[in-house]
Regions:
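FAD-binding core/adjacent interface of flavoenzyme oxidoreductases
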Residues: 2-16, 83-158, 238, 266-275
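Beta1-alpha1 glycine-rich phosphate/pyrophosphate-binding loop at the start
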Residues: 13-67, 159, 164, 168-191
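Short amphipathic alpha-helical segments
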Residues: 28-30, 52, 132-135, 173-175, ...
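A conserved FAD-binding loop/helix module that cradles the flavin
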Residues: 28-29, 170-172, 287-334
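N-terminal glycine-rich dinucleotide-binding loop that anchors FAD/FMN and/or NAD(P) in oxidoreductases
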Residues: 33, 37, 43-45, 52-79, ...
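A Rossmann-like FAD-binding core segment of flavoenzymes
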Residues: 70-108, 114-117, 180-268, 313-334
Length: 334
């Protein structure tokens, strides 16, 4: 494969992508097809690993999450992309202080290795911070769910309980009512509906249970219901809960990229330019759930493509500027 090799050594790449999910792999394919030298550092911890399938992904609906990533890695390798299995813990700028200096970075891995990059794309995703209720973590991604567009079809017409872990539970309740007429909202000593919301719940024939949820009732490796603090068991086939969404932002923070509270109050994320994912730090991009907490897999993949194209354009601009500088010096030397 023909490729500009001016900056390529065993540990130096034009672009280092940190995170090997849908966003990172899509960016890697885009950059590989642009003849860029690309390294993907992947910790192997996809957010959707507990789920049986990926949904809402055109032509791949229901595919196992790991199979989708395997396919993405194979495609990226076909364009010369390299991979490291490991965890990036920090990065720092190594560019000179003089005006017009080329951007460059060192990326540090947990095992002590360091790789060099001209540009960095962070696609490390987010962590779902689950409510502290017995059974939630064990059933997460199976019959404890959060997104109707990811899981609603699979639990259609079933007995679904909405756990009042955050005020947004009312919004989730109304959404999931589209998939099932058998919806129960558990206020859980957290949610306090307004008069208008009580009216909406009644109009949609949604049951409301007061009191704190103590645990999930699980039998034969299946959810059977929720257990209230009073000991009452409410039979259910699925539980919906909102999570706090926390961007995996350690590398970005080490570079000085600010991490801020999401406008909807659902967690922390990184603000980026919507036209390509550039962060506030020159030479550093972010894509996928680390920037878009609400994005589904296909949206994350799309943001990776956009970021890859933006990074390539940024490199082209720098290379053109440097070529002009060389040409000017050459003409002066004649």
């Amino acid at each position: 494969m023909s490729r500009d090799t001016k900056t390529e050594t065993a540990d130096e790449y034009q672009v280092v992508v940190i995170g090997g999910g849908a966003a990172g792999l899509s960016a890697a394919v885009t950059l590989g097809r642009a003849l860029r030298s690309v390294l993907v550092i992947d910790a192997g911890e996809p957010r959707n690993a507990p789920a049986a399938g990926v949904h809402g992904f055109l032509s791949r609906d229901g595919i196992d999450p790991r199979e989708l990533l395997d396919m993405g890695r194979e495609e990226a390798r076909g364009y010369g992309v390299d991979f490291i299995a490991g965890v990036a813990v920090a990065a720092r700028s190594t560019a000179g202080a003089e005006e017009g200096a080329e951007l460059s970075f060192d990326v540090e891995l947990a095992d002590g290795r360091t790789v060099k990059a001209r540009r960095i794309l962070v696609t490390t995703g987010l962590t779902d911070v689950l409510p502290d209720i017995d059974g939630i973590r064990e059933r997460w991604g199976r019959d404890v769910l959060h997104c109707p567009y990811c899981h609603g079809w699979e639990v259609r017409n079933k007995a679904i309980g909405i756990l009042g872990s955050v005020p947004m539970a009312l919004h989730q309740t109304m959404l999931f009512r589209q998939w099932s007429p058998n919806i129960t909202l558990f206020l859980n000593d957290v949610v306090e509906p307004t008069d208008a919301e009580w009216e909406q719940l009644a109009a949609r024939s949604i049951s409301v249970v007061e009191g704190k949820v103590e645990s999930l009732a699980i039998q034969d490796d299946a959810l059977r219901g929720v257990v209230l603090a009073s000991g009452t068991v409410i039979p259910l086939e699925a539980v919906v809960t909102a999570t706090r969404l926390e961007a995996r932002s350690a590398v970005l923070e080490s570079l000085g990229v600010p991490v801020v509270e999401h406008p909807m109050g659902v967690g922390h994320h990184v603000e980026v330019n919507p036209m390509g994912g550039a962060t506030a730090v020159p030479g550093v991009w972010a894509a996928g759930n680390v920037a878009d907490l609400m994005g589904q897999v296909m949206a994350s993949a799309a943001s990776g493509v956009m970021a890859g194209a933006a990074i390539n354009a940024h490199l082209v601009a720098e290379e053109t500027r440097l070529a002009v500088d060389v040409a000017r010096l050459s003409s002066l030397a004649r």
